[in-house]
A protein has these predicted regions:
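Conserved acyl-donor/pantetheine-binding loop and adjacent beta-alpha core of acyl/acetyltransferases
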Residues: 45-64
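A gly/proline- and charged-residue-enriched helix-loop-helix capping module
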Residues: 59-104
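Short catalytic-loop micro-motif centered on adjacent basic/acidic residues
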Residues: 99, 158, 264-267
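Aromatic (often tryptophan-rich) hydrophobic motifs at membrane interfaces
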Residues: 84, 193-194, 198-307
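A conserved beta-strand-loop-helix scaffold within acyl/acetyltransferase catalytic domains
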Residues: 1-50, 102-241
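A short, internal acetyl-CoA/4′-phosphopantetheine-binding micro-motif in the GNAT/acyltransferase core
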Residues: 65-75, 130-131, 233-242, 270
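Active-site/acyl-donor-binding loops of N-acyltransferases
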Residues: 42-47, 113-134, 262-327
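Short, high-confidence coil segments that cap the C-terminus of an alpha-helix
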Residues: 23-25, 92-95, 259-261
């Protein structure tokens, strides 16, 4: 299998989210004399029918993605031809609209901003591992203090590369979701974790924080080329006072540096606010570097989009996208 530009563009990545998003993963590939573009998405059935016919919309799988240029010698012409080809493809397959979460590191929104009406959402955070002592120079002062105190109290960690099992991680993760009153979407089931091991065992690291021989926090991280992607983590309720979540981020930074990775992508907050608590937590480990996260909205069949909005009695210009899924 040919290596993708990044994890989120890998051909198996979308398969992880078919069940969760109730969709079917697919990749559209466009190649001509001007270059190559691929676009990975999930195809979701729209519940409402129009004149007895079934229609679909497209969405980027969990995380980031969207259309991406692999190479080009005439970018303007390539983009024009891609748009024409993709419009035809959507019409032939009853695809009405597409919602894209562009990749903040690859920055593919720069090439597709006009086509998808790209909209800035928020900052996402980065630790650069190819610089000197990232855990000293890029971690916040209070963060470094929390790490020292946790270690002095006896918290340590272990790193498992390419883990065979992640059963213990799941228990800790679910307990954290319970504590945070998370929506059902984030309660990934056994099939999801089995698929992660099936497709990405060799791109996975499991880090566990331990205290008195007990695993008290754990994190699951993807590695791809020279990037580490923070994925899922959790802490047992009764050990929150030891701040083991800080140890996990410290550990992934140390391990990543030792193993030649260039950066850690922490993602952003739950909202677009710079006072968002998750964003502020992540900023502890990335005080120097960030990047921009954009979304894209594209109506591929205006007539059908408007008909669906009419059926649902919503305004097509509604900011929620696609508008017909609002209610």
């Amino acid at each position: 299998m040919k290596e993708a530009i990044d994890l989120y563009f890998d051909e198996n990545y979308g398969k992880l989210y078919e069940k969760i998003e109730n969709g079917k993963a697919n990749i559209f590939e466009y190649v001509d004399e001007n270059g190559k573009i691929t676009n990975q998405f999930l195809i979701r059935e729209i519940p409402e029918k129009v004149e007895g016919n079934t229609f679909y919309d497209l969405v980027t799988p969990y995380g980031y993605g969207g259309p991406v240029i692999h190479y080009s010698n005439n970018k303007e012409k390539l983009l024009e031809n891609y748009e024409n080809a993709f419009t035809k493809y959507c019409k032939e397959n009853n695809f009405v609209s597409e919602f894209v979460r562009f990749h903040p590191i690859i920055k593919n929104y720069e090439d597709f901003s006009k086509m998808y009406n790209a909209q800035y959402m928020r900052k996402t955070l980065i630790t650069k591992l190819d610089e000197e002592e990232p855990e000293v120079n890029q971690f916040g002062k209070s963060c470094r203090k929390n790490i020292r105190q946790a270690m002095n109290k006896g918290v340590s960690y272990r790193v498992t590369e390419n883990p065979d099992s992640i059963g213990s991680f799941k228990e800790i993760y679910y307990s954290t979701m319970d504590r945070n009153n998370a929506t059902d979407y984030y309660y990934f089931d056994d099939d999801y974790f089995n698929d992660i091991l099936k497709y990405y065992k060799n791109n996975l690291i499991l880090i566990e924080a331990t205290f008195e021989d007990k695993v008290i926090a754990a994190g699951l991280y993807f590695t791809y080329k020279d990037i580490i992607h923070i994925h899922l983590s959790g802490t047992l309720n009764e050990y929150l006072y030891l701040s083991p979540a800080y140890i996990l981020r410290y550990a992934v930074s140390v391990w990543g540096k030792e193993n030649g990775y260039k950066l850690i992508h922490h993602g952003g907050g739950r909202s677009n606010s710079e006072e968002d608590s998750l964003y502020l937590f992540k900023k502890n480990f990335a005080k120097l570097y960030d990047t921009d996260f954009y979304i894209g909205k594209k109506i591929w069949n205006e007539e059908l989009y408007n008909k669906l909005c009419e059926i649902k009695n919503v305004d097509p210009s509604e900011s929620f996208f696609p508008a017909y899924r609002k209610i």
